[in-house]
Amino acid sequence: MKDIKGATSEEIRMIRAIQRSVGALDNGWIGNQTLSDIAAKLGADCFPLNVELYGQPCILARDIDPVNMSGPLPKDAISGGFSWQGQPCSILVRGGKVVRDWSCHYPRPESVLYKTKDGAVRIARVSSAAALGDVVWAVGGLGLLDRYDPAAEGFSGVYSDVLRKTNHTVLGCKGGLLYGVYCKAMTAQQVNALCRDKLKLEYAVMLDGGHVAAINGACSKLNTQTRQFYAVRFL
């Protein structure tokens, strides 16, 4: 959709106040970001929702299902975390069962977005899934926002390649919603800035990128036929 700006200073002031109250970027423009934040606040029945936010295809939903798989990307999904030789190599818990126990660069820890049994979504930097306790799901990746420190998580030297300018996917959360973001042709620093300054996410991890980065939404379908070993479905 085309963003709309208030015609008077008072209309802009009203829009910015609404944006601040729902956690959107208070820029005075009404677009998908503001409307999706309002929808989340009102409990609107429109999720999972596939929209573009600041030019980046996104899927928003109340919950996710991280899938260890082998094949094309399923519907309402983004490509998942780091994998090696056909298996996830970042921490992965699905349905309360540990699929991958160790961090990508064990013993160095990694940032993990996870959901507790009481429904809370949290983030922690750990080396093993066991350190999270009893969780519903957990997805490991490169920490973003205030946890952005690639070297601390082992993404340095030969492993710094994941920071390069390419397509990346992100899993984040804000205001009770999970965000799957397909970031087009960005460095890791640019991905971090998008999540922090525009999307205003509370927690976020960057997942795998390059040739495997993909999104399969109702409208956004990018690289959907590439064989995936790890995906995040939005429910």
Kindly give the residue locations of the regions a language model identified:
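Zymogen propeptides
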Residues: 39-106, 180-181
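Short, surface-exposed charged micro-motifs
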Residues: 50, 112, 170
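Beta-strand-turn-beta hairpins that frame and shape the catalytic cleft
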Residues: 53, 118-121, 173-179
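Short hydrophobic-aromatic micro-motifs
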Residues: 59-60, 76-78, 113, 121-123, ...
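Active-site neighborhood of phospho(di)ester-bond hydrolases with catalytic His/Asp-centered motifs
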Residues: 77-80, 204-208
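Active-site-adjacent helix-turn-beta-strand microarchitecture at beta-sheet edges
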Residues: 86-155
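Conserved, well-ordered active-site substructure
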Residues: 88-107, 161-173, 177-206, 212-235
